[in-house]
Amino acid sequence: MNQHPGPSTQEYLRLIGVPQLAPATSPFDPGYDPVTVESHLAQSAHLISILKISMACWIIADEGATLAKLAAAKRYGVPTVTGGGPFEVAVAQRQLPAYLDLCAGIGVNRIECGEGFTDLSLTPTEIARMAGERGLEFQFELGKKHGGAFTSSVTDDLIDQGKEWLAVGAKELVVEARESAQGVGLFDDAGTFNAELAEKFVDAFGFQTVMFEAPNKPSQFTLLNHFGPAVRLCNVRLEELLRVEIYRRGLHSDAFAHENLRPPRPAEG
């Protein structure tokens, strides 16, 4: 029920032509306190595809605080995923079973797998089996964290790798961009976006399967400008989620200038 005179915010968005969009951003919690995380969920849960409990912060934080964050996400109907770093460390230290037991035990829905700074000693099939035995979904991150910007041949290899992970049950694929979107993945040393290579990932997997890391404003706006509102973004800080989503809907002044983002003008009458 509307709590004030006039249209609700959702009704107003419809009046100005903004379409209803399914959640297409996976923001991350870089180690906020539980109250802050829950406040963001209260404000933006309807905009979140899956919440990443990122880096290894949740492992060294007070466990009760981590459990409180996960419980809040569950109350708001937002699934959760761990970052790829702890997974890689667990594999390298030969403790993947214990890590998976921990993730399942605290109530995470999904883990992120990857080879960003290590080389896996286990096959995708083995990892898929271990995750499945514990009721965990998994996604896979494509690309090295210290390997520089992608080349065409590297992109082709990553597409093949992504297909291998999808074949064993990966729910989504993530294209690496780290925290800088510069000198890594689809961004060169100057931060220039390689649209041609990005399109190869979309052509291979489609928007519903591939997510692009967009850790800062330039990378977020560049990806949305190029692909439009359908592109799935991740590694967006929680406090930047609303900015990304107004841009996605053409409500940001810069986005309004782009025909593929600007809402269609409603008919008169």
Say what each PLM segment does.
Residues 55, 106, 110-116, 162, ...:
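Glycine-rich phosphate-binding active-site loops on the catalytic face of alpha/beta enzymes
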Residues 21-27, 50-52, 77-81, 109-112, ...:
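Structural preference for beta-strand elements that scaffold enzyme active sites
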Residues 11-14, 35, 58-72, 89-98, ...:
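Active-site-adjacent beta->alpha loops and helix N-cap segments on the catalytic face
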Residues 1-70:
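Conserved N-terminal beta1-alpha1 strand-loop-helix module at the mouth
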